[in-house]
Amino acid sequence: MRRKLVAGNWKMNGSLAANALLLAEIKAEFGNPACDVAVCVPAPYLAQCLSLLSDSTIALGAQDVSSHDSGAYTGEVSTAMLLEFACRYVIVGHSERRAYFGETNELVAQKTVRALSAGLMPIVCVGETLEQREAGQTDEVVGRQIDAVLSSIAENDLAKIVVAYEPVWAIGTGKTATPEMAQEVHVMLRRRLHAKNAQAATEVRILYGGSMKPDNAKELLAMPDIDGGLIGGAALKAADFLAIIRAA
């Protein structure tokens, strides 16, 4: 049985003071959850959060990584740098990276390969826009996104990735896919994974990343192919994040 994963994506939020308060509040009520938990924080705060989480089972993650190893790539962060801060996870291909920074399926695949080669666990994000969903293109668009990654990685690396389905139309809009709508896409993704490596496909965790909140987490997480959540806004509020963790 797949152990669920709840990963908080802080996006471009936080401060030294706010981070310390948030993590202190989470740790105070954390207990011994039945799921894995991670926080993916802005790169400048990795050192601070590594220190704050040193006595916790909460894993540390980054929000992006360079497809390059090192060199003259101003502003980029390499896998080696992330490893120095004990990162376990790294988000690749988030819808905001695709929409605002022009990241292509090919670049996302390259970043995934780079992360895997360094021993990081990439959280590979896929998802469709409202326009694409209304045009009946969900399977086509999301399928292309995941296939670009699957065709680039070795068969025996499949079990080392996490997939996150984030319907773009449900992020920050207040709209949420019904559990059944989300499950339908997760099943499609599982089938794609199965075609790559049948055994590994049963082990890969597929997270839901479309505005999971305390009031919908339990229903979403009850779906057989929803193996956790990639949490945005709710990860910035200790009570909300803890409620989702408990629902998992």
UniProtKB/Swiss-Prot annotation:
Subcellular location: Cytoplasm
UniProt organism field: Herminiimonas arsenicoxydans
GO terms for MF: triose-phosphate isomerase activity
Gene Ontology process terms (BP): gluconeogenesis; glyceraldehyde-3-phosphate biosynthetic process; glycerol catabolic process; glycolytic process
Keyword Ribosomal protein among record annotations: no
Biological or metabolic pathway of the protein: Carbohydrate biosynthesis; gluconeogenesis; Carbohydrate degradation; glycolysis; D-glyceraldehyde 3-phosphate from glycerone phosphate: step 1/1
Keyword set includes Kinase: no
Higher taxonomy: Bacteria, Pseudomonadati, Pseudomonadota, Betaproteobacteria, Burkholderiales
Protein's name according to its UniProt entry: Triosephosphate isomerase
